[in-house]
């Protein structure tokens, strides 16, 4: 067996299948751009879903890839086991209705055993198959020469996700030798069992049946191959190391952590070894995820990153690292992965900045949070319970930034659990909107429909013309072929030549009409058919439309004109965002309609008002410069050398369409644009907001829509000026004057309230009682707010010199409570914080504070008198 690096194994796999006629699919972004059902890209096949479910027909039915993936369903096991990871690479080869079992098995065996490739000893390989898969058995036994005793039949060797494609699978296992298990009485010591000796190398799935809704299985018209090989596991076998963490894919990060911490990996301390592994795994995940546009936050993908970083920080304390350091590992990850993922090193400064910022935020609260957690655990043990309440867990999350899973890990070490349901109840009360976690879902759907069968050619000519003579070459109604559509009927059709743009790249579809003698057909929408043609959704308004009919296709030019203004404006906006906010900004989604444009982009903070103003002005300056928009076809490599922006998640062919706005903007884009920026007229931002997980959104209008918006705003300004009895240019002066008047009135009101408070405080001194030699005053008073309550408390403490005072007021059915204890009584054990907590609890509230002054709130005004009566009991209890 050869000595290979992880990078060499990856490249060798791709080279092998390229020799077998496969197209190499680039590794897609970890953030899914075309599949809202996925939180992360979680497998090699996840990015190929569009091919397997028939929505898109691939140019080459043979595909291979090395796909970066994230799975987060068992984070708590990372570091504890030899092979659990949150970030991993899946190597795969796929067939979309082309080759099947014999080729898949033959090539897998060749790659693993040939001296030209991996060069495994055949005697160390075993395979598992489904008990009824005789075809696979025959191929393995008779053609590959694997003896019967090393072909194990297992019931679980059947890939099935419910409805949709399914089929048997075969797995290949490598025997690492007796050092990893030699107790043959162990019922799990076999290929496919839970053991460390026989490691799964490769899983080949033979997708040959359709699992129908009624539970039956029928053969698929086209059989598919879907295989997966984990790069990290394969590397551990080739490099003959005990765990994936001991490979060259992880050891550089572990080595850097050794240098930072002064501790040693594999020095006999299993707890420290676990910390090294957690840090190495989590920094890989965070580095790649941030590089692909995800940012730490409290929801969705951002929450996963925050949880991983904070878990790593928590484990770093076991290595005596008490400062931000994870950001220093980002360039180390980049160096390890640079052969296949050069973009990590290109973005390392930005990624490190994001990681450092998140580390610093957590370090600010970590010490206090751990102290609070220690108190909570100690209190629970005193109360003879092994459960940390949901309220306490939520407080740790909300105030100290402890993800619930982190609290659960701390609790587990203390032999306790967390009331997760109680935590969720507290979350539900607190959050303003539902944050339902999306689950990773299965990768394929039911195959079917006639659209995938339509192979007739169709040419889009809409870049240069708005009307053309065409022929209807395919006509579909209710998912089936049809020869005609009557007036009032809806259907789908394909034209041999069409000026109608199909929705893509965020740009909405054209609309318009198809006209013939006595026939008028409304084109409502246009989408891409599975084989790439423009598929028109239509409704017949007049006459009968027949297949092969000659029609005149005419787009709505007024609608198109507004759309192209907004589309070119998004390109200008994209570049302006990079110029103002930084090169880390990347498009995360867009919508271009005739009325407005919406642009989503990666950014880790709110865009400030002055930044928005600068961005808006930059875009308008480019419009006013009347720059020609040039569109050309270029080879992909030439376009990239020119500096053209390629968008995350987009797949490009060998020849791409380049949209260039002077020397300012250069993007790969298949959309429609203005000929000159002057056509846009004017650009106006109407909103900027966060849409979660480090993604911001700008909404804007151009042309007529921008004019109408500004006209409306001028109208509102005039109306407001009229109500203030001034003119628009003087409205700010008028507003400043009104604010000054209000401020003066507030000042006079506060002065009057203070005087009244002082008078009431003087009257209250007559109500002071002596309890066990201590002056006690507990009274309900009439004041406007807590500030007035504090003023009154200060007056009373000064007047009484030595006293325990509790004041309560009721406003809008809410109770404010303030407790005060003079310095001489604090030394005797009296504590305002403890007292106010008890008083508040008796009128439906809570609170606390310092020994000398503390405040609280209550919800039940009717119980205030009863709550104040407790003050005497408290004084008696302390004086005993």
Swiss-Prot record:
UniProt KW Chloroplast keyword: no
Catalysed reaction, written as an equation: tRNA(Ala) + L-alanine + ATP = L-alanyl-tRNA(Ala) + AMP + diphosphate
Cellular compartments per GO CC: cytosol
Co-factor: note: Binds 1 zinc ion per subunit.
Database matches in PROSITE patterns: AA_TRNA_LIGASE_II_ALA (PS50860)
SUPFAM superfamilies: Class II aaRS and biotin synthetases (SSF55681), Putative anticodon-binding domain of alanyl-tRNA synthetase (AlaRS) (SSF101353), ThrRS/AlaRS common domain (SSF55186), Translation proteins (SSF50447)
Binding of Zn(2+), residues: 567, 571, 669, 673
Enzyme class: ligase
Signal peptide (residue range): none
Documented EC number(s): 6.1.1.7
Family classification: Belongs to the class-II aminoacyl-tRNA synthetase family.
Protein name, as recorded: Alanine--tRNA ligase
Gene name of the encoded protein: alaS
